Structures are given as structure tokens and as C-alpha cells.
């Protein structure tokens, strides 16, 4: 089959259709099954702190589902349908993709400065992991490690840095309270279903190839 030329308008319609905008909205009660169909169409749901109307991650659901319980994403995470991880950004991801992200947890490729900090603060990181093990789930403010006034932007203290490092390595996983942007950190074994967490993980090259194919399918 030869190359197919599309106008800009046609290409936009193809992309919007692939993302589920051609599908009918549900007419009855919206539940986790409807959320799952949306995620299967989109591939993932990006998380963002922007909060003009609601948190940005809620808007794609409203655009495709209309009125729905605002706890849908949290419910899906609690039931093991989704997990949170850094993909291109922080995202809610279908749980079956967890093995495809294990290479990123092993290699920690995008956050070299955070990895270097963790290497230089091994005892602190280990202590934070012990705290999560004994008291989790916790939020970063539970650690009370800030020794200076909070500055601009994120300005993470040592406790938050340790939690984020452990989150990226897969030692801890995250949930969120309904309508609350703060991450709740807990041991991965208490968040990720055991059969998913222990499933064979493909090599980095194979995982990246499969993720690329899936990304193309959603567009």
C-alpha cells in the first residue's frame, strides 16, 4: 500500500477519532468500566497540577464521558486497574503496562540528578523506605524534614526527594486521595497487584518498542 496524503483537517479528525471523540457518551450511570474504555482509547491519562476548573486529569474524562463520579480514577487505582508512574510525564497508566515500565524503574533514565542525590544519601533514603513500610501510606509532609521555609515552585525537601526517588525506582507506589493532588506513598507490594508486580519484565529495547507501537495506535 502506498503513502496516503491527508489534509490537516483530515489528520485532525483521525487523531480525534483515535482518542475516542467519535464515541457516544454514556447515558446511564458512569462507572469504572466506562473509565477503562476511555483509557484503552487514550492509552493513559496525564496528571497535571493546573486547577482552573478542576485538575487537568479530570477534563479528558468529562470530554468523553460527561458527568461522572470524580472518584473514578482513584477507585480504578484502588482496584488495581491503573497505576501512577512517570511516562512522558506523571500519568495514570493501565495496570497491564506495569511490566513495560520496569526498565525505567531499573535504569531511572530521566532523573540522573535525583539518582545522584539518592546515592549520596543512602541512609536517609533507607530510613524513609522504613517509614513507609511501617506507617504507609504517607504524604511527604508526614516526614517533617523541611529545615527552611518553602520557596518557589516545587522546592522539595529531603523527605520528598527520597520518596520521589523510591517512587521512580518502583520501591514505593502512589495513590491519591479523592480530589487531592498530593501523592500518597506506600510500598509497591501494597498498591500493585502481586501477579502484575511479579510478572516477567521485557528487556528495555523490547519494552520501548512495544510502548512505541501502543502510542502510535492511540493516534
What are these language model-derived features?
Residues 1-219:
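Long, low-complexity intrinsically disordered regions
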